[in-house]
């Protein structure tokens, strides 16, 4: 019998292990991981493909982490069924794992596109370490690649392939890139930077067909244009990994609904990370927030509750820190401008900087900073804490907010004693 059974081995799982061990030093912890690799930093896989970091640098938690925390780690073990009534998880090999408390931290997987001509050699996803190893084996300088999807995953794949010397085209179905976290004005700045790097960007279009016999030779777009390529990367979004829960009785919407303790509607079964449909305090709705920091925090909270230490989540909202060809971007909170919200924009074309905030009910609820990202952390903190803008509103409008403008009590929280001087 496993006191604690965790399905998954990424950010949420490691957070849960640490959460459990802060409360329970002795309970048995078993981790089932579909992947054969140790926990690695998924946001770094594009840097690994580009050759900016080696394989050791992307390991997030090494073997010493599992041994120190007395974790029974089962790599290459995929869970295929959960029975909450019997408190048993069954793996693909038919082995049964009984448990007292269960955490589902299976993350997400790429959306499979139903394209005519799919299944050819040279067609890849770009989501996990195996995808990167496969790409490393086949790509070579001078090749042509098409990336389907202009979101975070697609653009990081495109950047890495371009840095490896490939001729890259990005095809995005929406009117502009990163449409889930940027507005059109900031996306235009990003698109210009990407085009200058040598990557072709096609928006408002789709890939309809993959050409070639056994190998990828090109694609046909919805517009009818044909593009030659030997590598095709599909990066059109992700979905939570919940198919193995089909007969479990655990409810699944867009993700697995959880309460403030990260517990599902089945007692003793918790969920955390990209697989979760949790509370977004800004939109005041349940939603999936598939970002690394949220996954870790949710796992930590789940782990502590599993071990008997009550802890509640205040919810998670979207936030991202990214860079494309040297252009730094930080976003947080709400994107769309709704009734009653004030939008403030500052754009300096000469410095290639863009700043946009949303204010609602005298509180900062959304932010985009591009180029100059100083004080983005302060703004994100203000969003998280729902801090009234008050006298800071004029500073927010001018984009000149810095720590000295914050109340002394807030500076001490953010920066310690040095911050109040």
What label would you give each PLM region?
Residues 119-142, 214-220, 225-301, 391, ...:
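FAD-site-proximal beta/loop scaffold in flavoenzymes
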Residues 28, 57-58, 252-255, 309-319:
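A short alpha-helix-loop-beta-strand transition element characteristic
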Residues 1-72, 160-182:
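Beta1-alpha1 glycine-rich phosphate/pyrophosphate-binding loop at the start
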Residues 26-28, 73-91, 97, 163-260:
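A Rossmann-like FAD-binding core segment of flavoenzymes
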Residues 8-11, 127-128, 148-153:
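Glycine-rich Rossmann-fold phosphate-binding loop(s) that bind the pyrophosphate
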Residues 1, 5, 61-146, 220-224, ...:
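FAD-binding core/adjacent interface of flavoenzyme oxidoreductases
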Residues 2, 22, 275-376:
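Mid-to-C-terminal Rossmann-like scaffold of FAD/NAD(P)H-dependent oxidoreductases
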Residues 350-410:
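C-terminal auxiliary extensions adjacent to catalytic cores
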């Amino acid at each position: 019998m496993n006191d604690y059974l965790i399905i998954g081995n990424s950010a949420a799982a490691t957070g849960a292990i640490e959460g459990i061990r802060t409360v329970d030093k002795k309970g048995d912890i078993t981790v089932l991981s579909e992947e054969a690799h140790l926990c690695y930093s998924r946001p770094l896989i594009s840097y690994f493909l580009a050759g900016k970091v080696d394989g050791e640098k992307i390991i997030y938690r090494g073997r010493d982490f599992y041994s120190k925390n007395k974790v029974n780690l089962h790599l290459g073990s995929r869970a295929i069924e959960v029975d909450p009534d019997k408190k048993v998880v069954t793996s693909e090999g038919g082995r049964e794992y009984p448990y007292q408390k269960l955490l589902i931290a299976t993350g997400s997987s790429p959306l499979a596109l139903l394209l005519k001509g799919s299944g050819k050699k040279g067609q890849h996803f770009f989501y996990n370490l195996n995808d990167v190893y496969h790409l490393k084996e086949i790509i070579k300088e001078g090749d042509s690649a098409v990336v389907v999807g202009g979101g975070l995953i697609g653009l990081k794949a495109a950047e890495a392939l371009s840095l490896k010397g490939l001729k890259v085209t990005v095809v995005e179905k929406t009117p502009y890139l990163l449409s889930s976290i940027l507005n059109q004005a900031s996306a235009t700045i990003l698109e210009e930077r990407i085009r200058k790097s040598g990557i072709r960007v096609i928006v408002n279009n789709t890939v309809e067909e993959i050409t070639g016999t056994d190998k990828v030779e090109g694609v046909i777009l919805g517009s009818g244009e044909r593009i030659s390529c030997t590598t095709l990367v599909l990066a059109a979004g992700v979905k939570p990994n919940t198919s193995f829960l089909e007969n479990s009785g655990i409810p699944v919407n867009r993700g697995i609904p959880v309460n403030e303790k990260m517990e599902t509607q089945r007692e003793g079964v918790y969920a955390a990370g990209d697989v979760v449909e949790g509370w977004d305090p800004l939109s005041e709705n349940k939603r999936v927030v598939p970002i690394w920091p949220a996954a870790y925090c949710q796992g930590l909270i789940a782990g502590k509750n599993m071990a008997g230490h009550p802890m509640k989540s205040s919810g998670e909202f979207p936030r991202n820190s990214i860079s494309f060809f040297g252009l730094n971007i930080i976003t947080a909170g709400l994107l769309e401008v709704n009734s009653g919200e004030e939008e403030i924009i500052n754009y300096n074309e000469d410095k290639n900087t863009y700043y946009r905030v949303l204010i609602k009910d005298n509180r900062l609820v959304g932010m985009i900073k591009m180029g100059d990202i100083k004080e983005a952390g302060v703004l994100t903190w203000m969003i998280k804490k729902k801090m009234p803008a008050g006298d800071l509103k004029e500073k927010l409008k001018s984009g000149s907010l810095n720590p000295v403008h914050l109340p002394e009590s807030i500076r001490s929280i953010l920066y310690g004693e040095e911050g109040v001087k």
